[in-house]
């Protein structure tokens, strides 16, 4: 039996409790969220979220442990992990494709008969594209450059330099999130105020969630770098984080151009001659 197990390059996964607990956490999160949306208590949703975070921590801790023992993650397994990350990002692209479809369905008459003749709809005051959104664009583009520098540093075996540039990237990610939160707090429209606000918050909010996840991903990479988990030849976890961060950058460029810039370009102040 031992010889047959070592006669292939695949990782035979040990029994794990995390898939089962994760499914329970997902169920509690979903039902708790629905319950809260129908004027119920938010605590079931928060409990499900906390349980899911615990599962994520434990499961990823085990994966990192498997990677560090030097036996489980063969070249074939690493190739599979890379393919899995690419497919995961592809599935995320489909998510955002749906949000952009909803946005253009509401704005472009050539696509939908239900599209608004005036966009943004009358009464909606959109954000100035070249205010906070443009600043956030510069921040994310800069963070894309800093994470690339960090990648080059680890490729050359410079763990100290990699950690330093990762810190820069994390700080930029936190700055983006803070500015996004400031923008939401000072918005003149709420999520349920119409099709404009719904598509706006869905698209930008989902992206903001990805920025938070990506920032956490990079923070984990920083601590793994400090512990010596990454070398010039072996840093798959860092590669996955960098790919994810670049994906977040690209999505934001589309959001800035389509939702903020083009989507808000038709706004006419109420005191202009158009409304008279």
Pin down the residues of each PLM region.
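...captures the hydrophobic TM-helix bundle architecture rather than a specific catalytic motif
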Residues: 1-276
């Amino acid at each position: 039996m031992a010889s047959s197990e070592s006669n292939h390059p695949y990782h035979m996964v040990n029994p794990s409790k995390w898939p089962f607990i994760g499914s329970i956490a997902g169920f509690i999160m979903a039902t708790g969220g629905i319950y809260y949306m129908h004027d119920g208590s938010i605590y079931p949703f928060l409990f499900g979220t906390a349980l899911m975070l615990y599962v994520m921590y434990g499961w990823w801790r085990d994966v990192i442990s498997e990677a560090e023992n030097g036996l489980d993650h063969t070249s074939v397994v690493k190739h599979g992990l890379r393919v899995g990350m690419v497919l995961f990002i592809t599935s995320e692209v489909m998510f955002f494709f749906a949000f952009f479809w909803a946005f253009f369905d509401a704005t472009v008459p050539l696509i939908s008969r239900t599209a608004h003749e005036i966009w943004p709809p009358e009464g909606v005051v959109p954000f100035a594209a070249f205010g906070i959104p443009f600043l956030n664009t510069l921040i994310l583009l800069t963070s894309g450059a800093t994470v690339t520098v960090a990648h080059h540093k680890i490729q050359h075996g410079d763990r100290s330099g990699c950690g330093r540039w990762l810190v820069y990237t994390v700080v930029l990610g936190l700055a983006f999130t803070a500015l996004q939160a400031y923008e939401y707090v000072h918005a003149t429209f709420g999520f349920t105020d119409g099709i404009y606000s719904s598509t706006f918050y869905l698209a930008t909010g989902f992206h903001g969630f990805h920025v938070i996840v990506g920032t956490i991903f990079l923070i984990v990479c920083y601590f793994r770098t400090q512990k010596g988990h990454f070398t010039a030849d072996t840093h798959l976890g860092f590669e996955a984080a960098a790919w994810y961060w670049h994906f977040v950058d690209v999505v934001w460029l589309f959001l800035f151009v389509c939702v903020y810039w083009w989507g808000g370009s038709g706004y006419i102040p109420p005191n202009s001659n158009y409304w008279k």
